[in-house]
Structures are given as structure tokens and as C-alpha cells.
Amino acid sequence: MIGAMAWILDLDGVVWRGDQPIAGSAEAIARLRASGEDVGFVTNFSYSPVETVEAKLAGFGIEARGAVSTSAQAAAGLLEPGERALLVAGPGVRQALEQRGVEVVADGDADAVVVGWHPEFTYDRMAAAMRAVGHGARLVATNDDATLPTPDGALPGGGAILASIERATGVTAVVAGKPYPPSVAALWARYGREGTMVGDRPDTDGRFAVALGYRWALVLSGVATSAEVDPPPDVVAPTLADLVAAYGP
């Protein structure tokens, strides 16, 4: 048994794959909660508003209101209320910024440029970001994931968009999502210093677990297909359901 005060779950590859739930995930989460464990969800996918993520989980029979943490929220936390942000990202980032009290602008001078994955990213948006950074705006990113997993294979992720802006501006962004310090601080504030991080991507979830000081539980239902990864996991299971059955309460 893993004696953890909190179980933090990545979503894609752990709870669902694309638009389909991974078998047994809802039941595993229900078992954890019935045993008094605190379950939270953390995702680097910044495009969708939190309510959309919560609704998707609810559609799979998983109650998640108030339990979802996104890289959009972490990025918004790097700005102060009243600041101006030039948005190069999706509606989830806009919502997080506006809830923070940040003014979102489409062009012109800004205190920060906030970059996240967006399927309609264009040269014009890159140029607007470049101009704003050239005029002194900070460069903030939700995440630097190079790829985005889809049922049809990997596609360019938010990190690919970010790389183009970093190259154009010569500025390295402050990255907010997993496994970087802003998300670490947010998770510590919410769940404390003891827990288990469950994920399928060693480069983000594994490194995040190490940064948090949490146990690193790797499931092989997503990106990783072997336990031979870096950082090495504390425990490995085929799915979340198998993990909870073997190591849970």
C-alpha cells in the first residue's frame, strides 16, 4: 500500500485516452475517495476552460468540481491583477487570466505575453507576440510540451508554438505548467508536501513528482510503454485501476 495524503492524477493517458475513459479509472478514483484519500487532477493542456475538463470527467462518472488544476491557472498566477496580457493561447488561458483580474489584449503593448497551445496559431500572432516582447513584455508559457498526444498520433504541442516565439524574440519564457516551479508551488499550497503523482509521461509527470517530493507512480496506459524510464518510478502498473488495486488503500 502507498500511504499518501494526496493522489494527484494526470488526465490524458491516466484517466482517459482521447475521448474515451480508460477502463477502471472511475472505480479506482471512487475507491481512493471512499478510503478518505484526497484526489486531484492536474493537466498541462491549457486550451479548455476548467469547467470543460470537469464536465468531461463527470461524463465518465468522476466528480471533479474544484479538483482540477491546469497549466493555464498556473500561468495566470504569474501575473498580477490589473496587468495586461497579450494572449497567444486558447479560451482556457483567457478564462484563467480574466479570473485573475488580468486585462487580455489582442495586440499592442502588454505586461506579459502568455503562450499556450492553440490549433489556429498563426504567423500574425507570432508577430504580435514578438512586438510585445520587444517592447518589454515578459514571456510566459503554460507549458513547453513539444507534442500533444491524439488518437491519430502526436501533433505539435504548446512547446512547439512557444519555441517559435522564443526563437523570434531571443527570450526564454517562464514556464508555468508541469514540471516547473509555479505548478509545484500551486500543488503544495493545495495538497501539501506528501502525496503520489500518477502519470504516463516521465518527462513531465515523472519530473513533476520529483520536484514535488511525491512518490512517482507510472502507468503504462498512455505515452510510456516501459518501466525503463528517467526518472525511474517508485511503482509501475498497467493502468490506474491496477495501481490502486496493488498499492492503494
Residue ranges and their predicted role:
Residues 1-27, 31-37, 46-69, 73-249:
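Asp-based, Mg2+/Mn2+-dependent phosphohydrolase catalytic module
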